[in-house]
């Protein structure tokens, strides 16, 4: 069956918009920034779309949320951090599945690793690029970790539904 580039582009745009919306529905972090369910949608989109296209689509959604939500200073970092997260989730999932491991386990490990990338990425970005310093950046680590745990729970539990409707096979 030939893959439809139009359908893939449409689903990529949909996930971009969904990541943006889920990210904008946020609650403020105790020191700087915010936490949201955008990462859960980001992981879903990354695994559904796959490859560099999927990573770019979901990372753009997160960056657009920063621009719209008043966190423009975070936008460049978010683009790079979320791109690294998505690529980590996609590539590690693909690697683990090559060993014929259960998909849920692969997503759990890949999602956890991607969220560690997010936590480390935002710590470095806040501490050194935004010049908040390591102490202020470290204060957000528990909040980012909570966001990561929620993202893993959402993405790992919802992905079987995405798979069941056949969206992954049709792209």
Each predicted region: which residue ranges?
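Loop-helix junctions at membrane interfaces
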Residues: 1-171
